[in-house]
Amino acid sequence: MKRIAFVGAVGAGKTTLFNALRGNYSLARKTQAVEFNDHGDIDTPGEYFSHPRWYHALITTLQDVDTLIYVHAANDKESRLPAGLLDVGTRKRHIAVISKTDMPDADVAATRQLLCEIGFREPIFELNGHDPQSVRQLVDYLAALSEQEEEAGEKTYHS
């Protein structure tokens, strides 16, 4: 079964998205430790990005995942992506999500440009984790990838 890890800075919206992909749109609490859902997907604490001493824990956590979803808030002007993180595991799929697009100070265009500059390619998803319609775009994309992999004979992501 394919596994997904959600990574990003403190307050980026990882846990909100992690929960929303399973239909839970309630207010997320701060993630204090690595959390797994019933499919083995991983929600990582933002502190793993904020403090270099935790990078080893982040890299170790990501070893067994197939897809890395990087969540970056639309009102965050800086990249906090640890150097080399996109190079961990050569076969990993990298997906970028611009979160908090509904915030008054959101700058989606600048955030998209920043994500492209640090190595992400389209599609880059723009969403509000509390809006089922915007989350649906990502769910549909993951389901389509799962179908493609299934047709190719690979194990599938759980939708």
Swiss-Prot record:
Q: Where does ATP bind?
A: 8-15
Give the molecular function GO annotations. Answer: acetate kinase activity; ATP binding
Q: Which NCBIfam families does UniProt cross-reference here?
A: EutP (TIGR02528), PRK15467.1 (NF012011)
Give the matching SUPFAM superfamilies: P-loop containing nucleoside triphosphate hydrolases (SSF52540)
Catalytic reactions of this protein: acetate + ATP = acetyl phosphate + ADP
Does the UniProt entry include the keyword Nucleotide-binding?
yes
What does this gene product do?
Answer: A putative bidirectional acetate kinase that may drive flux through the ethanolamine (EA) degradation pathway under anoxic conditions found when this bacteria infects host intestine. It may generate ATP that can be used by other enzymes (EutA and EutT) in the eut pathway. Can use GTP instead of ATP with reduced efficiency. Overexpression in E.coli yields elongated protein sheets; prevents artificial BMC formation by eutS alone or by eutK, eutL, eutM, eutN, eutS in E.coli.
Question: Example GO biological process term?
Answer: ethanolamine catabolic process
Q: Which gene encodes it?
A: eutP
Name used for this protein in its record: Probable acetate kinase EutP
Q: Which PANTHER family match?
A: ACETATE KINASE EUTP-RELATED, PROTEIN YOEF
